């Protein structure tokens, strides 16, 4: 028997909140005022974790090269093509580091961080927490512009009709574009790879030699890695790229999946009791509000209990 529960919450926390369903299905909707996005999580988010008894050190974004180079970066970097085939890496502080054009680079973004990278062709990549991107120092002499992603990234690709852009996900799985914007979610252990098109058109192939699926804006292709099946569906693409603007946006997402996302965003460990496995939530919250705010919101709109034990956040 379904029942509907309404609880009053503070107006400063949300403009609309609803709780509906049975003990196995809870939906909480949250809408907050848009603010200028910042680096996530912000210092106050780390302070929240300290106050809650969770010790978190600010993790480092690291860029490495196949020749042994290792750089610690902050929030953004840009590859710039110079005269005579030279390439330089410019950091957000203005520091420039010359790079050999044949270098293969990799940037690793740990849990608790995000990073923005401009490639030498002007294409932009936003990397979410817990992600890795492999790419060449320059595409100048390449017939294709190829990169490899593990984790989640949002791409805005500069159009080049002579050189398609290729995003490789492993095992021949590939996305080919000319000029467009799209989100790729390919975290290890998730069991599926999801690509969502925002603008333009992309071609998707699940493996080498497989028939290519062409996506239009607001379409999504999902590959089940265990079953090997591919499905295309219509979605609101803005939901899937909202993270790069500083939003945590979730629709009918299970609490275990949401807890896993919170763990990546804030670099913490979140455990969910078995009884909450089928609870689902929908909402849109600024990530820089901090994890304490988000967990309190879940408690305010449901019977979820949040507590910290031995540095681990437990939801029961």
Regions found by a protein language model. Name each.
Residues 1-3:
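N-terminal intrinsically disordered, acidic low-complexity segments at the extreme N-terminus
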Residues 5, 10-22, 31-316:
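A residue-level detector for the "anchor" residue at the start of short, highly conserved motifs
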Residues 25-26:
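Catalytic cores of soluble metabolic enzymes centered on carboxylation/carboxyl-transfer
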């Amino acid at each position: 028997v379904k029942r509907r529960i309404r609880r009053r919450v503070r107006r400063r926390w949300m403009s609309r909140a609803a709780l509906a369903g049975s003990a196995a299905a809870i939906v909480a909707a949250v809408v907050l005022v848009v603010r200028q996005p910042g680096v996530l999580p912000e210092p106050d988010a780390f302070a929240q974790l300290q106050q809650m008894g969770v010790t978190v050190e600010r993790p480092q974004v690291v860029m490495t090269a196949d020749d042994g180079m290792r750089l610690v970066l902050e929030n953004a970097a840009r590859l710039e093509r110079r005269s005579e085939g030279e390439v330089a890496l410019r950091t957000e502080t203005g520091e420039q580091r010359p790079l050999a054009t044949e270098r293969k680079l990799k940037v690793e973004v740990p849990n608790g961080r995000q990073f923005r990278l401009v490639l030498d062709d002007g294409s932009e990549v936003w990397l979410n927490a817990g992600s890795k991107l492999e790419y060449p120092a320059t595409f100048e002499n390449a017939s294709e512009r190829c990169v490899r992603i593990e984790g989640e990234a949002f791409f805005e690709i500069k159009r080049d009709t002579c050189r398609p852009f290729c995003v490789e996900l492993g095992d021949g799985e590939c996305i080919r574009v000319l000029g467009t914007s799209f989100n790729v979610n390919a975290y290890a252990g998730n069991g599926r790879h999801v690509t969502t098109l925002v603008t333009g058109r992309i071609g998707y192939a699940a493996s080498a030699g497989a028939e290519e699926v062409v996506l239009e804006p607001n379409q999504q292709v999902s590959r089940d890695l265990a079953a090997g099946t591919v499905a295309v569906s219509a979605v609101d693409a803005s939901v899937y790229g909202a993270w790069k603007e500083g939003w945590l946006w979730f629709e009918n997402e299970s609490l275990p999946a949401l807890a896993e996302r919170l763990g990546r965003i804030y670099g913490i460990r979140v455990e969910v009791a078995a009884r909450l496995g089928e609870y689902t939530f929908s909402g849109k919250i600024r990530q820089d509000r901090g994890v304490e705010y988000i967990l309190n919101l879940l408690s305010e709109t449901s019977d979820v209990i949040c507590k910290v034990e031995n540095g681990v956040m437990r939801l029961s």
